Amino acid sequence: MPFSHTKIVGPAGRYGARYGMGLRRKITAIEIKQRGKHRCPSCRSLVRLKRLAFGIWQCPKCGFTFAGGAWVPQTVMGKTLTPEELKEVEIQKARWRETGK
């Protein structure tokens, strides 16, 4: 069987002409982000993290295993807030409560 990945379709080339172009474009976008280099939260090195299971990631350099997103290691919702950012959020909540009453 010939090599199914090409420069144009990327990793979705393994599906051939099946499933439609829209879905294959979405898959390509997800898989390029998923297999790209990400920063390890423990050793801070920029490496290709290994996906062990759905949302479980491991750094090949330090061996640190952590929970992240399903398709990418760090999600926007899972971003850790610094204490200063957390205080700012609490201040904004208090202002909102005062204006709402």
Swiss-Prot record:
Binds 1 zinc ion per subunit. The keyword Zinc applies. It comes from the Archaea. A zinc finger (C4-type) spans 40-62. Keywords: Metal-binding, Ribonucleoprotein, Ribosomal protein, RNA-binding, Zinc, Zinc-finger. GO terms for molecular function: large ribosomal subunit rRNA binding; structural constituent of ribosome; zinc ion binding. Signal peptide: none annotated. GO terms for cellular component: ribonucleoprotein complex; ribosome. Its cofactor is Zn(2+). One of its GO terms (biological process) is translation. Pfam families: Ribosomal_L37ae. Belongs to the eukaryotic ribosomal protein eL43 family. NCBIfam families: PRK03976.1. This is Large ribosomal subunit protein eL43. It comes from Pyrobaculum islandicum (strain DSM 4184 / JCM 9189 / GEO3). The gene is rpl37ae.
